Amino acid sequence: LSDRKVQVAGSSLLWAVVLTATKLIVGLFTGSLGILAEALHSALDLLAAGVTLYAVRQSARPADRDHPFGHGKFENFSAFVETLLLVLTSVWILWEAQERLRDPAFAGPRTSVWGFLVIGFAIWVDWHRSRALARVARETGSQALEADALHFQSDILSSAAVLLGLGGAALGLPQADPIAAVVVALVVLHVAWGLIRRSVHALLDRAPEGVADDVRKRVQAVTGVEEVDSVRVRTSGPDLHAEVVVRLDGGRPLTWAHDVTDRVEAAVKEGYPEARVTVHAEPLSPAEAPSEEDRETDSLP
């Protein structure tokens, strides 16, 4: 799975280079703020794709002495950095757009067939990139790749806004270009807000919604578990870490308790195959412990 993640991230980086160069050349030739904004956006995409590639390579490294829980946080940090780049892009676009909207001498960009072709090409590339990234992200649980996929889905919408701006300029509406640039910025900010929340939640070890309750139900269904004291879950990149404290009959042999904790771990992994599960067993108090009669009727060995 890690090889697939690296492969799709590397492909995304290569296409980011192609799009950045193409948009920059056409933007300078036509003088379109919309295309130049897209060129800057693609340049930041290039940086983000590089960060993502580095992150998925690092996150695949096994746990070591200094990182006993693995390197999955590289992916969460990558998503956070990409979000900051999206915000910077939006701020620059909004500033340049308002400058042109306030300039009465602004005559609009030079329109040409090249402007329409390069943005159409960008939409085609971003559509294929986002689909590939989203597919691998779903299969591997990679937040970094998912962030990249959402990023490029927003690029499709923003590129469509640029096409509208170029079309307006061709029809004698010069203000259409900076207005389209504002649309680009707003779309990017909208996506950035969602990404920054999710990446910060992961970096701060916020429990994934509903997962702790589901794990608790699975553990409670295991024969031999008398009580579930606590369930703590967190994510580290694509990995889920679960810590479970259960109460067992303290009058049973240690081998029996070990067997129960093994089945608790198996029950959690049935729903979350890639989870790293830690189970701690505590004995029930004497008043809570099952009677000898209950133990004799227990089907467990």
Regions found by a protein language model. Name each.
Residues 1-9, 66, 71-74, 192-301:
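Peripheral (non-transmembrane) domains and long loops of multi-pass membrane proteins
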Residues 1-214, 300:
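Alpha-helical transmembrane cores and adjacent cytosolic helix/loop segments
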